[in-house]
UniProtKB/Swiss-Prot annotation:
Location relative to the cell: Cytoplasm
Protein name per Swiss-Prot or TrEMBL: Translation initiation factor IF-2
Chain positions covered by the region annotation G3: 596-599
Lineage: superkingdom: Bacteria
Organism: Caulobacter sp. (strain K31)
Record region (Disordered): 1-169, 184-451
Positions of region (G1): 549-556
Length: 1045
C-alpha cells in the first residue's frame, strides 16, 4: 500500500513495475475515499474501489453459447494483450494475478462448453419432439426459402480488461431455414425463421463504461437490450431484465388469451435482426467462476451505441392487449420445449403478427384457462414474482390462481388441483361450466322473448305402502313445493319430509298426470312358489300316506310291519313323539311314502301338518279299544284337509278285538264304511301277525290310481318342512317332503325365515342322494338355522333373492312378537292391574328339545294349561343341546331349564351349578307336562273355606288399665273357642273382619272354649272399639289347594 503522495510517479518504483495502488483506473469502475486509523495514532486516507456484485446468469433460452471458432478468435486478443505488456504492464497486475485470471477464464470457458453440450442434448430431444409440428411449419417454410439469406459470423470480442465486468459474447450464427425442424450445429443452435434479415458487419466492442455514469436513453435503432436486473439479486440468480426501447410494444402483462399449443424446441428462436442487442455473453451464475475482463480500446468506441447508465425511471406500465391467442397444448413441465416462433422484425420496424394469431384478437372468453395468468416455467425476464402477482391481480380480468408471497415456483405451469379449482378467493370467483351454460340459456331466452314452455312428461310412478313427500317428488320429477301446494289446497299441511300413505300419493301422482303402480313389501313373496304345471309335463308320482290315530293303537308297529323294520322298540315310553317320513318300495316296484304322526294330544299340530301334506289318511283304530279322543281329532284333521280315509282296525289278533264295534262308533262321527253303503274303506289288520297287510297295500295303490297323482320333475323343487332339528356336528338338519320338481345338491333353498345352499341329501336310511324327486322325503343339510315344521320351502335363483325373502319374514315375525294377537294379547293397563292385584302370576321357562316339532308341541300344551291367574311364559325355545348361553339366560330370568331328549354340555352343567340354575331332563312328554302342571297349580291362590263355631253377644264393655277393653259376653249359639277367627257385627254392619280371639276367660280363669248359655270375657287382638250390643261371630278358616284342570 502506498501513500497518496506517490500517486502519478511511475518512475519511483525501482523494479520498473507499475506501483500497486487502490486508485481506480480511468473509466473502469467507480471509486471512493476512506480514512484509515492505525493503532499508533496515525491516520491515512486511501482510495477504494466500489464493486457491484452481479451474480446473474444469462437467460437460458435467449443467449446462445459461442462456437469454437468464436472462442479461438476471442482468445487471440487476450494472448496478445497479455504478452505485449509483460508480466506487470498489462493493467498493472502481477504474474500470480494474471495466472489466476487465466484460470478463471479457462473455468468460464469450460462452463460455457458444458452449457453448449447441455443445449445440444436438449436440441436432440427437441428434434424428436418437433416431428409433430413439421407439417404445420412446412407451409410457411416454402414462402421463407425465397427471402432467406445467411448471416455472417460476428467477430470475437477483444482482449479482456481488468474491470470485473462480464464478457461480451460472440454473435450466434444465423442461417436461413430449409425446414421447420431445428438443425444441430457445433457452435450455436440455428433457429428456423420465415425471413431472416442480413446481419450487419461485425463491429468492435466499445471500451468499458463506468457503471455509475449516467446512461443515455436508448435510440430508436436499439430496440431491446438484455441487462442483469438490479432489483432481483436476492430472488433469482439467472433472471435478466427485459427493457424495451422506443417503438417497442407496450409493457405489462401479456395478453390473457390462449397461446399457440404444442411444444417448442429448446432454444430454437428466430435469428435476431441487425442491432447491438443480444451481443453479450451469458453471465455466470452466482457463485460461479469469474469471467474474463473486456478488452480495452479494441476497435474504439461504437458511436452508434448509447453510453452511460440507463434512465432510472419506472418502466412503462399497463396491461398488454387482452385478445385470445390460438389454442395450444398445455405444457405441464417447466422444462418442456416451446414451439418455434416466427422471425422477429428488425429494430424499429413494424412487428408482424405471430404465427397463428389473428390481426385483431377477439374479446376475452367467459371461461379462461386456469393456468393462463400463472408465470411461465422460466419466469418473466427481470421481473419479481411479487410484482407479477400484484400487476396481474390488478389488471387481468381472468381468474388467476393465487399463490402465497415467497412460495416456491418450481411447480408453475403444471396442471394441479389448485390450478384447476383455485384456492381461497380465486375458487370463489371461478365460474363453472354449468354457470356459463345457464347464463347462455338465459340470454337465449331473453332474445326469444321469454322462457320456453316446459313439456311435462308422463311417467309411471311406483308407490309403496308409505312414502315421503321428498321421495314422491323425486319419482315424479316435480319440485317438492308443488306437491306441498297441492296438498295445502286439499287441506293437508305437510312438510317435505313428512310421510303420506299410498292413497294420498296416488291422488297426487294422478293429479300431476302420471300413471301409478302400487307395490307393497309383501310383493317379495310373489313368485316364491312357482305357477301350476302344464298337464303335458306331468308324470306319475308315488302317493303320500299319513298314518293317524290314538296313542298306543299301533300306528308305528303297523309301519314297521310294512317296512319290515323295528322302530317302535327304540322309542321312549313306547310312544311316537316325532313325525317320521319313510318311503317303502313294494315288491311290485312301486313306491309309497308314509308319514308317521304322534298320537298324543300334545302333538295336535303335527297331526294337522301331516293331514295337510298327504294324499290319503290311514286311520288306525285298536279293535279292543275303539274310537278314542285322538281318533276323533284325526278325523277332523282329515276332513279339514279334504283327503280320503282308509280305516285300519288293528290288533285283530287279540281276543277282545271287535271290528263291528269300531264301525258303529265311527258312524257317530259320520264315517260310513263301504259295507254300510258309504265310501270309506275298512281293513282288518294285525301288525304283530301281519294279517291284512297285503290287502291294505292294495287298497292304497288302488286309491292312488283313482286319484291319478302326477307331478312335474323337470322344474325347481318346492315342498314342505316336516321336521327340523339342530344336530351337533351337522348343524341344522331339516326333514322335507318334495311335492313338485327335483331337489338337487347345491340348490339355494329358502325355508321359512332360513335359507342356505343344500350341502347334502339323506334318506331315512342315512344314505347320500344326489337328487330327490316328487313325493320323496329327505333330510337336507346346509340351512343357516332351524326352520319351523310346516313351513313351505322352495328353490330360488340366487342368494340375493333368498336374503330378501328371509329378511322380510324375520321382520314380520318380530313385529308379531312385539304386538301379539289373540288370547295371549293384553294391554299394558290390564297387565299392570293384574300385577297390582297379585292375582296374575307367571312361570318363566327355557325349553330345549331334540327337534323343533317337539318344542312346538310342548309350548302348545303349556299354553293350553294357562288360566287367568297363572301361565307359563316361554323365555326361549328351540332345538339343540343346552348351552352356556341358555344357562345365563335362565339365570337372568329366574327360570328353570327344561331339556326334552337333550342333555347339557359339561361346561353348561358346571356353569349351572355355580349360578344355581335348575336343569330338568325329560324323555317322555307325559312326565314333562305333569311336572309343569303341578308347579302351576302350586302358584294358584288356595281356596279359603269357613266353618261356623258359634255366636256371642256383648253385655258390657270393661276398660281395664294396662290391658285394654274387655267385652263381657254371653254365648248365644254354638261354642266360642280361643284362637278362632271372629267377625264383629254392629247394627248389621261388619266392624271387624277376620279378627282373632286372643283371650277367653270364664270368671278369672282362662279357658279354651265356652259353650252356649254361659258368660265369659273376651279380648281381641288389635281391636279396642267394643260396644254393648255387638254380635261376635266365631268361626275357623281352612285353606284348600287348587289344581289345574
Amino acid at each position: 500500500m502506498s501513500d497518496e503522495n506517490d500517486n502519478g510517479r511511475p518512475g519511483s518504483n525501482p523494479g520498473g513495475r507499475a506501483p500497486i495502488t487502490l486508485k481506480p483506473r480511468q473509466g473502469s469502475v467507480s471509486a471512493g475515499v476512506v480514512k484509515q486509523s492505525f493503532s499508533h495514532g496515525r491516520t491515512k486516507t486511501v482510495v477504494v474501489e466500489t464493486k457491484r456484485v452481479r451474480p446473474h446468469a444469462p437467460p437460458a433460452g435467449n443467449l446462445a453459447a459461442p462456437s469454437s471458432a468464436e472462442r479461438r478468435q476471442g482468445d487471440a486478443p487476450r494472448q496478445q494483450s497479455s504478452s505485449g505488456g509483460g508480466g506487470s504492464s498489462a493493467g498493472g497486475l502481477s504474474q500470480g494475478e494474471m495466472l489466476a485470471r487465466q484460470r478463471a477464464i479457462e473455468a468460464a470457458r469450460e462452463h460455457q462448453e458444458r452449457q453448449a453440450a447441455e443445449r445440444r442434448a436438449a436440441e436432440a430431444r427437441a428434434a424428436s419432439e418437433a416431428a409433430a409440428a413439421r407439417d404445420a411449419a412446412a407451409k410457411s417454410a416454402a414462402a421463407a426459402k425465397a427471402a432467406a439469406a445467411p448471416a455472417p459470423e460476428a467477430p470475437a470480442a477483444p482482449a479482456p480488461t481488468p474491470a470485473p465486468v462480464a464478457q461480451a459474447p460472440a454473435a450466434p450464427v444465423v442461417q436461413a431455414p430449409v425446414v421447420a425442424a431445428p438443425v444441430q450445429a457445433p457452435a450455436a443452435p440455428v433457429a428456423a425463421a420465415p425471413a431472416a434479415p442480413r446481419a450487419e458487419a461485425p463491429r468492435p466492442a466499445p471500451p468499458p463504461v463506468r457503471s455509475d455514469a449516467p446512461r443515455p436513453a436508448p435510440t430508436a435503432g436499439q430496440t431491446r437490450t438484455y441487462e442483469p436486473s438490479r432489483d432481483r439479486r436476492d430472488d433469482r440468480s439467472s433472471t435478466t431484465t427485459y427493457r424495451p426501447g422506443p417503438g417497442a410494444p407496450p409493457q405489462g402483462d401479456r395478453p390473457q388469451g390462449d397461446r399457440p399449443q404444442g411444444d417448442r424446441p429448446f432454444n430454437q428462436r428466430a435469428p435476431r435482426p441487425d442491432g447491438p442487442y443480444n451481443q453479450r455473453t451469458p453471465r455466470p451464475d452466482a457463485g460461479g467462476p469469474p469471467r474474463g475482463p473486456r478488452p480495452e480500446g479494441a476497435g474504439g468506441f461504437r458511436n452508434d451505441r448509447p453510453q452511460g447508465d440507463r434512465p432510472q425511471g419506472d418502466r412503462p406500465q399497463g396491461d398488454r392487449p387482452q385478445g385470445d391467442r390460438p389454442t395450444q397444448t398445455v405444457r405441464y413441465s417447466a422444462l418442456a420445449p416451446r414451439p418455434a416462433p416466427g422471425a422477429r422484425p428488425g429494430p424499429g420496424g413494424p412487428r408482424g403478427a405471430r404465427p397463428g394469431v389473428p390481426a385483431s384478437a377477439p374479446a376475452t372468453p367467459e371461461i379462461q384457462r386456469a393456468t393462463r395468468s400463472a408465470p411461465r416455467p422460466g419466469g418473466d425476464v427481470g421481473r419479481k414474482p411479487e410484482e407479477d402477482d400484484d400487476r396481474r391481480k390488478a389488471a387481468a380480468p381472468g381468474k388467476a390462481v393465487s399463490r402465497a408471497k415467497g412460495a416456491p415456483i418450481r411447480r408453475e405451469g403444471r396442471l394441479t388441483i389448485q390450478t384447476v379449482a383455485g384456492d381461497g378467493d380465486s375458487a370463489d370467483r371461478m365460474r363453472s361450466l354449468a354457470s356459463v351454460r345457464r347464463a347462455r340459456e338465459r340470454e337465449k331466452e331473453k332474445r326469444r322473448g321469454g322462457p320456453a314452455d316446459v313439456v311435462k312428461v308422463a311417467r309411471e310412478v311406483i308407490i309403496p305402502d308409505v312414502i315421503t313427500v321428498q321421495e314422491l317428488s323425486n319419482r315424479m320429477a316435480v319440485r317438492g313445493v308443488e306437491i306441498i301446494k297441492f296438498l295445502m289446497r286439499q287441506g293437508v299441511m305437510l312438510k317435505i319430509n313428512d310421510v303420506i300413505d299410498n292413497d294420498t300419493a296416488e291422488l297426487v301422482a294422478t293429479e300431476f298426470g302420471h300413471t301409478v303402480r302400487r307395490v307393497s313389501e309383501a310383493d317379495v313373496e310373489e313368485g316364491f312358489i312357482g305357477a301350476e304345471d302344464v298337464d303335458d309335463h306331468l308324470e306319475p308320482r308315488p302317493p303320500v300316506v299319513t298314518v293317524m290315530g290314538h296313542v298306543d293303537h299301533g300306528k308305528t308297529s303297523l309301519l314297521d310291519a310294512l317296512r319290515k323294520a323295528d322302530v317302535a322298540s327304540g322309542e321312549h315310553g313306547g310312544i311316537t313323539q316325532h313325525i317320521g317320513a319313510y318311503q317303502v318300495r313294494l315288491e311290485s316296484g312301486q313306491k309309497v311314502t308314509f308319514l308317521d304322526t304322534p298320537g298324543h294330544a300334545a302333538f295336535s299340530q303335527m297331526r294337522a301338518r301331516g293331514a295337510n301334506i298327504t294324499d290319503l289318511v290311514i286311520l288306525v283304530v285298536a279293535g279292543d279299544d275303539g274310537v278314542m279322543p285322538q281318533t276323533v281329532e284325526a278325523i277332523k284333521h282329515a276332513r279339514a284337509a279334504e283327503v280320503p280315509i282308509i280305516v285300519a282296525v288293528n290288533k285283530m289278533d287279540k281276543p277282545g278285538a271287535d271290528s263291528t264295534r269300531v264301525v258303529n262308533e265311527l258312524l257317530q262321527h259320520e264315517i260310513v264304511v263301504e259295507s254300510l253303503g258309504g265310501d270309506t274303506q275298512i281293513v282288518e289288520v294285525s301288525a304283530k301277525t301281519g294279517q291284512g297287510l297285503d290287502e291294505l297295500i292294495e287298497r292304497i295303490l288302488l286309491l292312488a290310481e283313482v286319484m291319478d297323482l302326477k307331478a312335474n320333475p323337470d322344474r325347481t323343487a318346492d315342498g314342505v318342512v316336516i321336521e327340523a332339528k339342530l344336530d351337533k356336528g351337522r348343524g341344522a338338519v331339516s326333514t322335507v317332503l318334495v311335492k313338485r320338481g327335483t331337489l338337487k345338491r347345491g340348490d339355494i333353498v329358502v325355508a321359512g325365515s332360513q335359507f342356505g345352499r343344500v350341502r347334502a341329501l339323506l334318506n331315512e336310511r342315512n344314505e347320500q342322494l344326489t337328487e330327490a324327486g316328487p313325493a320323496t322325503p329327505v333330510e337336507i343339510l346346509g340351512l343357516d338355522g332351524v326352520p319351523s315344521p310346516g313351513d313351505p320351502f322352495a328353490v330360488v335363483e340366487n342368494e340375493a333373492r333368498a336374503r330378501e325373502l328371509t329378511e322380510y319374514r324375520i321382520r314380520l315375525k318380530r313385529e308379531k312378537s312385539m304386538h301379539p294377537v289373540g288370547a295371549g294379547a293384553t294391554s299394558m293397563a290390564d297387565m299392570m292391574a293384574k300385577l297390582q292385584d297379585k292375582k296374575y302370576r307367571e312361570l318363566p321357562l327355557v325349553i330345549k328339545a331334540d327337534v323343533q316339532g317337539s318344542a312346538e308341541a310342548i309350548i302348545g300344551s303349556l299354553d293350553a294349561m294357562s288360566t287367568d291367574e297363572v301361565r307359563a311364559r316361554i323365555i326361549l325355545s328351540g332345538a339343540g343341546a343346552i348351552s352356556e348361553s341358555d344357562v345365563m339366560l335362565a339365570k337372568g330370568a329366574g327360570a328353570p331349564l327344561i331339556g326334552f331328549n337333550v342333555r347339557a354340555s359339561a361346561q353348561a352343567r358346571a356353569l349351572a351349578e355355580r349360578e344355581g340354575v335348575e336343569i330338568r331332563y325329560y324323555a317322555i312328554i307325559y312326565d314333562l307336562l305333569d311336572d309343569i302342571k303341578g308347579v302351576l297349580s302350586g302358584m294358584l291362590a288356595p281356596i279359603q273355606r269357613e266353618t261356623f263355631l258359634g255366636n256371642a253377644e256383648v253385655l258390657q264393655a270393661f276398660d281395664i288399665s294396662k290391658v285394654g277393653k274387655v267385652a263381657g259376653c254371653r254365648v248365644t249359639e254354638g261354642v266360642v273357642r280361643k284362637g278362632a277367627k271372629v267377625r264383629i257385627i254392629r247394627n248389621d254392619i261388619v266392624v271387624l273382619e277376620l279378627g282373632t280371639l286372643q283371650t277367653l276367660k270364664r270368671f278369672k280363669d282362662e279357658v279354651p272354649e265356652v259353650p252356649s248359655g254361659q258368660e265369659c270375657g273376651m279380648m281381641f287382638a288389635g281391636f279396642q272399639d267394643i260396644k254393648v250390643g255387638d254380635t261376635i261371630e266365631c268361626f275357623t278358616v281352612e285353606e284348600i289347594k287348587r289344581q289345574l284342570d
